[in-house]
A protein has these predicted regions:
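Terminal amphipathic helices with adjacent charged low-complexity linkers/tails
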Residues: 187, 191-208, 216-222, 399-427, ...
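Phosphate-backbone binding interfaces of nucleic-acid-interacting proteins
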Residues: 1-214, 347, 366, 370, ...
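A carboxyl-terminal module marker
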Residues: 2, 446-449, 599, 615-810
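Extended, well-folded interaction surfaces typified by the phenylalanyl-tRNA synthetase beta subunit core
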Residues: 420-424, 428-581, 722, 775-777, ...
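Mobile "lid/hinge" segments at catalytic clefts and subdomain interfaces of large enzymes
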Residues: 118-133, 140-143, 154-164, 317-416, ...
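Glycine/proline-enriched, intrinsically flexible loops and inter-domain linkers
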Residues: 5, 23, 28, 38-40, ...
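Class II aminoacyl-tRNA synthetase-like tRNA-binding/catalytic domains
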Residues: 91, 115, 292-332, 336-339, ...
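Conserved mixed alpha/beta core segments that line enzyme active sites in large multi-domain catalysts
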Residues: 49-80, 151, 261, 267-336
Length: 810
């Protein structure tokens, strides 16, 4: 959200620098992410002066160039070569001096330098309107009125205004601050309470006798009061639609809003002032003289303001002139009802629409307008008339015309806010430090939270309707703390803490731990839809377990997922279509299974996916493509970090995997990993190899060593390392070697790793050579060579007898 520093001063009489203002707003929860200088003409016309052409002669070596002598008030005439056909002696002109920089309306910035043009030196530039960013006109140089004073700074002549724009990262729950007045309310509260500055918070005056009419030609009917709890409107006649005055254009330009015309600009101005969206209709196009707020039949076609046709659904709220739709309520206007240069009479709407209704329509139609986003965050139902009056006063002032109807205000069920009983003592305990009673009262008063009754420790509060995020006592405490200031209390010199031991695992904490582990390895967490297409599932057993939806919103998304693979493949396809090929993804989620008639189960899973390269190409080396072993190492790290050791079993032809591995403990499947079959990838139009792992998260949580926290003293005695090489049958896996080592080492084995694998001509066909490293350590003494040799001899004997290994000795 963009907030103008100068604009904010219209409501709060503060005296802060932009940086200080940013610190205050950030302190009250409106995080200022950036502060950007703004000028109504980019660059502020620094180094640009008003001059007078004293002499003008043809260039000796170019027919289309002129050599001029220009007075800019410095006491010396500047020689400037000019290519404009309309340059002449006696003109007052805009001159850019050497060293200045211009920002044209179109194109790149232009640095003015001393130049020699066809042999004639030039010391500056006589400017056209587009060259200084004033307009897009390039019909020769800009000739000023004869009254212009030579030597005047162009910035002063054109009344260039300077401002600062604060970029605020507004959180979704703060719809009340989604406007200049909303920010001003928080600012004034903080300055008055935390900074004791005694500033005034002033809203625009909207009372006027022009609103005393008692009739209206255009009538309004609201057929759905749930989707539209309040609808306010007014008619204004004999307006002149034209360009907006500079002050209005500049206000909107500062916050990144394009000027359209005076009527539309006023509605946008009030939107960003109050946070209340408005819509102006051409009243003469409302043929029935009746506006109806209702929903239309499924499949109704509507042409929007940008000349695109959309198909409506039965839940889309529309503004109609009888039966014909004119506007998608709160989202987007229609082509045939908007204000144009020919408009003379307008019907101005200011309504309160349900945020849920607007969100569904805007999302389905992919129309993310400013109005829709304000309604989605939540607007104030009790300011529709004030915003309407503000806009009407500005329209009659700027566009001419007069108010020609009463204010229509359909508000059958007034939304006054909600009542909340809180305990002052409990709030102080929750805050963690004492805040005086009168300070709390003052904060609530400035935030427009009314204290209706104080009965000792108990307070009865009336929360205003615009405070949609204040629903409980803890929310009130948050409001108090953010204004009082989290930096207003001092930390004690000593902090005491304990290291708790948990008998029961903290699921969320464990997920966060693993998420941090994977994020540190370059993975990105995704959330995918648990509703999927039943046709995706290829495994027969899982297909029989599918849970079909009875009332699916679409014909394709018709079942709950039995595997998380296919939703992740959709993510891969989406990213690859946007040239994001190299992916490391993970997701915590659930799969859903039908066990029998009316019997279902949910299974928690952690899934990992790799695609593309593990590192990008550079001048020195080519990037390495992900393979099965990359994924295996990541899965192993996850299991080990939970203190869970598994044994591997290779499995073949398990669709949709090409080559896969299952990690098992006590015959329970802990994880399965593999590469996805080309036939499956083809259905998603994925051309790169994809490696996928699915981890039984329920089982890991149940067996995780995080469940019981224990503290172990760091080892005092050194570890001992030994290497062993052996030749084995090709079908024997490393997990068999690891299992024997763990069993035979009597808890002295700390680590076992495979550091070399050989298959080739130097050993018998059907055989392979493993080189394995063992690390041993005793918790209470230093192991002797004799003890190590006993362990190694026992291991070698076991490998020979159980695995048929041939030990390779030096």
């Amino acid at each position: 959200m963009k907030i103008s520093y100068n604009w904010l001063k219209n409501y709060v009489d503060f005296n802060l620098t932009p940086n200080d203002l940013g610190e205050v707003l950030t302190g009250v929860g409106l995080e200022v992410e950036d502060i950007v200088p703004f000028e109504t003409i980019q660059g502020g016309l620094e180094g640009v002066l008003i001059g007078e052409v004293k002499e003008c002669a043809k260039h000796p070596d170019a027919d289309k160039l002129s050599v001029t002598k220009v007075d800019v008030g410095s006491g010396e005439l500047l020689q400037i070569v000019c290519g404009a056909p309309n340059v002449a002696a006696g003109q007052k002109v805009v001159v850019a001096l050497v060293g200045s920089t211009l920002y044209p309306s179109v194109g790149e910035k232009l640095a003015i330098k001393k130049a020699k043009i066809r042999g004639v030196e030039s010391f500056g530039m006589i400017c056209a309107e587009d060259e200084i960013g004033l307009s897009e006109s390039h019909a020769g140089i800009m000739v000023l009125d004869a009254s212009a004073i030579v030597g005047t700074k162009a910035a002063d002549f054109f009344k260039v205004e300077k401002d600062y724009v604060l970029e605020i990262g507004l959180t979704p729950n703060r719809g009340d601050a989604n406007s200049h007045i909303g920010v001003a309310r928080d600012l004034a509260t903080a300055l008055n309470v935390a900074y004791k500055a005694k500033v005034n918070f002033t809203k625009p005056a909207v009372q006027s006798s022009i609103f005393n009419l008692q009739s209206s030609i255009i009538k309004v009917e609201v057929q759905d009061n749930e989707a539209c709890p309040r609808y306010s409107a007014i008619s204004i006649s004999n307006v002149t639609v034209a360009d907006s005055p500079d002050w209005l254009k500049n206000k909107l330009k500062a916050i990144g809003v394009r000027s359209v015309n005076n009527v539309v600009d006023i509605t946008n101005f009030v939107l960003h002032e109050y946070g209340q969206p408005l819509h102006a209709f051409d009243a003469d196009k409302i043929g029935t003289e009746k506006v109806v707020v209702k929903k239309l039949a499924q499949g109704t076609v509507f042409k929007t303001l940008d000349e695109k046709e959309v198909k409506l659904c039965k839940d889309d709220l529309m503004i109609c002139n009888g039966d014909e739709p004119m506007c998608i309520a709160g989202v987007f206007g229609g082509l045939n009802s908007g204000v144009t240069a020919a408009t003379k009479n307008i019907f101005l709407e200011s309504a309160y629409f349900s945020s849920t209704s607007i969100r569904k329509t805007a999302t389905r139609l992919n129309l993310r307008t400013d109005a829709a986003m304000h309604f989605e965050k939540g607007t104030d139902p009790n300011i529709t008339v004030d915003a309407l009056k503000r806009a009407a006063l500005l329209i009659t002032e700027i566009c001419g015309g007069e108010v020609s109807s009463e204010i229509i205000d359909l508000y059958p069920n007034k939304i006054e806010g909600w009542r909340l009983s809180v305990s002052f003592d409990r709030m102080i305990r929750l805050a963690g430090f004492f805040i005086p009673n009168d300070t709390v009262s003052k904060i609530l008063e400035h935030l427009e939270i009314k204290i209706e009754k104080e009965n000792g420790d108990e307070w009865d509060l009336l929360i205003p309707a615009f405070k949609t995020d204040v629903k409980r006592e803890a929310d009130v405490v948050e409001e108090i703390l953010r204004i009082y200031g989290y930096n207003s209390f001092t930390l004690p010199k000593h902090l005491k803490s304990s290291l708790p031991v948990y008998d029961k695992i903290d699921v969320q904490k464990t997920e966060n731990t693993i998420a941090e582990l994977l994020s540190g390895a370059g993975f990105i967490e995704v959330w995918t839809n648990s509703v999927t297409q039943s046709k995706f599932e290829e495994e027969e057993t899982l297909r029989l377990q599918q849970v079909k939806l009875l009332n699916s919103q679409t014909t394709e998304l018709d079942a709950l997922r039995t595997s998380m693979l296919y939703s992740l493949l959709e993510v891969v396809a989406y990213n690859q279509n946007r040239r994001a090929i190299d992916l490391r993804l993970f997701e915590f989620g659930k799969t859903y299974h039908r066990l029998a008639e009316k019997k279902f189960s949910e299974k928690r899973k952690l899934v990992l996916l790799l695609c593309g390269k593990s590192s990008s190409d550079n001048w020195l080396t080519k990037g390495t493509a992900f393979d099965f072993y990359h994924l295996k190492s990541f899965v192993t790290n996850v299991l080990n970090s939970l203190g869970h050791y598994t044994f591997e079993k290779e499995v073949s032809e398990l669709h949709p995997y090409n080559f896969n591995l299952i990690f098992k403990t006590e015959e329970i499947e802990v994880a399965r990993i593999g590469s996805i079959a080309k036939s499956t990838l083809k259905k998603f139009d994925i051309k790169n190899d994809v490696f996928y792992a699915e981890i039984n998260w329920d089982y890991l949580l149940e067996k995780s060593q995080f469940a019981k926290t224990s503290f172990v003293e760091l080892p005092k005695f050194p570890s001992v390392s030994r290497d062993l090489a052996m030749v084995l049958n090709e079908e024997i896996n490393f997990d068999s070697i690891e299992k024997i080592a763990i069993t035979e080492s009597k808890k002295l084995l700390q680590e076992i790793s495979l550091f070399d694998l050989y298959k080739g001509d130097k050993i018998e066909k059907g055989k392979k050579s493993y080189a394995v490293n063992f690390v041993f350590q005793h918790p209470e003494k230093t192991l002797t060579d004799i003890e190590i040799e006993k362990i190694m001899n026992r291991l070698m004997s076991k490998y020979e007898s159980d695995l048929g290994a041939v030990i390779r000795k030096n």
